[in-house]
């Protein structure tokens, strides 16, 4: 029995709702997607609750589900995945946090957030991270290390005795709100110590960054200064995730540029590749991702391709760029089909919906597409939120990999 390759393409935040400016259509309905529509016509489509009905997934919990794990059982915080995705080693007892370079102003003795992403485009990020690592390497005997992820994002790893991830964020998650003080979420010495350390990191980052030459240059150009690091999503890796090799016997690779998602992929045993020109934004070189995926399929059983630009555009409420990135994903699928049609099982899905009118993740079901050479087609003939309702699939996120394994002739029998 011939085993087929497996290709999973995820359009981050690609799911949407009706957009009035598009004549009450979704970006997927408006975008030109000949390859997605042809795959839908020849394959099976439907709706998927990535986590559970009505539950807005984070990108980390969503990908745990797409990789076949129950996020309610395995999720222990976003920070460790972000750190793994930028190549950090996160050991037992370490605390990892997700961070944003942000812009704050001093108002009435408080630091008030005016831009949570410091304009998002931040070519000075490596320079700022270097300054932080030189001037803020230790707090209360705890080693502190900053890692640049993509755009405005950083990961921070704390190493030392007596740490806890049971602490709140310093990121207020809203513009116009003051920077928060991290609080212990449990009355333990470890949580209290970690909260103090996180507060010290946050407010010292402001002292280091506010007058940094890179920020002076940004202000001169009319750009928002990246003058603080806001922290959130503390987590510890208490238990090792089972790998795809251990669970399914497959060798897998991930193609993308978003640290958080690549960290989840790395945690489940995938080899991680960031292609030339991949940025994690709308300016990514998606053709480079497609070429890289084709090459990797020569040596790997499964390749996962992540397209982040759809989500970046959604969070900005940018309909035009969302449509552009959907069409980029369609190109990636078409390019891969040119090489592996008949030789692979293809699955395409968002990891969650990020409607451009909401600008945040929502719990809407997302359109999912499955195509394999001998799969019996259903009645769906286009790929979008409305058209896939004619399809046969109505699944959870963690069911998708089982379907891919089944149609690639790799599924293991359950029972005698």
From Swiss-Prot:
One of its GO terms (molecular function) is metal ion binding. Its EC number is 5.4.2.12. InterPro entries: Alkaline_phosphatase_core_sf, ApgAM_prokaryotes, Metalloenzyme, Pglycerate_mutase_ApgM. GO terms for biological process: glycolytic process. Gene3D superfamilies: Alkaline Phosphatase, subunit A. Keywords: Glycolysis, Isomerase. It catalyses: (2R)-2-phosphoglycerate = (2R)-3-phosphoglycerate. HAMAP family: ApgM_A (MF_01402_A). PANTHER family: COFACTOR-INDEPENDENT PHOSPHOGLYCERATE MUTASE, METALLOENZYME DOMAIN-CONTAINING PROTEIN. This is 2,3-bisphosphoglycerate-independent phosphoglycerate mutase. It comes from Ignicoccus hospitalis (strain KIN4/I / DSM 18386 / JCM 14125). The lineage of its organism: Archaea, Thermoproteota, Thermoprotei, Desulfurococcales, Desulfurococcaceae.
């Amino acid at each position: 029995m011939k085993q087929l390759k497996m290709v999973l393409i995820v359009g981050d935040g690609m799911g949407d709702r009706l957009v009035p400016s598009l004549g009450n259509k979704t970006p997927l309905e408006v975008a030109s997607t000949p390859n997605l529509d042809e795959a839908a016509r020849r394959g099976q489509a439907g709706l998927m609750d990535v986590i559970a009905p009505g539950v807005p997934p984070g990108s980390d919990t969503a990908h745990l589900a797409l990789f076949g794990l129950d996020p309610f059982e395995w999720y222990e915080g976003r920070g460790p995945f972000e750190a793994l995705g930028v190549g950090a080693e996160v050991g037992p007892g370490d605390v990892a946090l997700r961070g944003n370079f942000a812009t704050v102003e001093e108002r009435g003795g408080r630091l008030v957030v005016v831009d949570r992403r410091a304009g998002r485009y931040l070519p000075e990020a490596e320079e700022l991270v270097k300054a932080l690592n030189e001037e803020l390497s230790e707090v209360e005997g705890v080693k502190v290390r900053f890692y640049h992820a993509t755009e405005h994002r950083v990961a921070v790893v704390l190493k030392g005795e007596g740490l806890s991830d049971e602490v709140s964020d310093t990121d207020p998650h809203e513009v116009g709100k003051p920077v928060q003080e991290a609080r212990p979420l449990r009355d333990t010495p470890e949580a209290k110590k970690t909260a103090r350390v996180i507060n010290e990191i946050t407010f010292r980052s402001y002292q280091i960054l506010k007058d940094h030459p890179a920020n002076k240059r940004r202000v001169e150009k009319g750009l928002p200064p990246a003058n603080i690091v806001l922290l959130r999503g503390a987590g510890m890796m208490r238990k090792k995730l089972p790998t795809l090799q251990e669970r399914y016997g497959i060798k897998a690779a991930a193609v993308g540029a978003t640290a958080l998602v690549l960290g989840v992929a790395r945690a489940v045993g995938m080899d991680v590749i960031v292609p030339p020109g991949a940025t994690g934004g709308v300016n990514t070189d998606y053709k480079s991702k497609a070429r890289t995926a084709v090459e990797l399929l020569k040596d790997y059983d499964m390749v996962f391709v992540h397209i982040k630009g759809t989500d970046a555009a959604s969070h900005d409420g940018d309909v035009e760029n969302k449509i552009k990135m959907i069409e980029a994903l369609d190109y990636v699928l078409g390019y891969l089909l040119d090489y592996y049609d008949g030789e692979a099982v293809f699955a395409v899905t968002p990891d969650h919906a990020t409607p451009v009118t909401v600008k945040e993740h929502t719990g809407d079901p997302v359109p999912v597409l499955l195509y394999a050479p001998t799969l019996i087609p259903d009645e769906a003939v286009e790929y979008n939120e409305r058209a896939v309702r004619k399809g046969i699939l109505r699944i959870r996120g963690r069911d998708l990999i089982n379907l891919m394994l089944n149609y690639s002739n790799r599924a293991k029998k359950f029972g005698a």
